[in-house]
Amino acid sequence: MTPLRLLYAVQGTGNGHVARAQALVPLLLAQPNVRLDLVVSGTLVDVGLPLTPRERYAGFSFRYGKSGGIDWFQTFWANSWWKLLHSIQKAPVAEYDLVLNDFEPVTAYACKWRKIPIIDISHQAGVRHPGAAQLLQPRRA
């Protein structure tokens, strides 16, 4: 049986996505019919990974203001848009049967443009799902 070629793409900014990868990578590596590669976007913070990444991308990072919300002006100027587009163009997603994505932008856009199967496992994907709980609109008196 031909092994499943799986690319696991992780957002490396912050510890949450990397912590999930620490739990999932050993489980995926234990599967006999899976060939796993890992890519990371952003800067790893405080936590290591159980597998050496095939690629590291600068990716895309949000900048936050003093009130805690996204500072769109700083976000726009802090990112290298040409580097991001180049990374998307060069991402090796076509070499894989499936891409498992944890809020990693480079492979997400590369898969979208090339119509490669992708599964999004981030919390953000869960709250976007049609079956997820929705905020109720307040009643007007």
Give the location of each predicted region:
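Gly/Ser/Thr-rich loops at beta-strand to alpha-helix junctions
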Residues: T13-H17, E104-T107
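Short amphipathic alpha-helix
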Residues: H17-L29
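An aromatic- and histidine-rich active-site surface loop
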Residues: L44-D46, V99-R114
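Active-site-proximal region of nucleotide-activated glycan assembly enzymes
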Residues: P117-A141
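A short helix->loop->beta-strand "cap" motif at the edges of active sites that frequently abuts
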Residues: N33-V34, R114-P117
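Anion (oxyanion) recognition and catalysis
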Residues: L29-A30, K112
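Conserved nucleotide-sugar donor-binding subdomain of glycosyltransferases
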Residues: G69-V106
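Conserved nucleotide-sugar phosphate-binding/catalytic loop shared by glycosyltransferases and other
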Residues: P3-L4, Y8-N15, A30, V34-K83
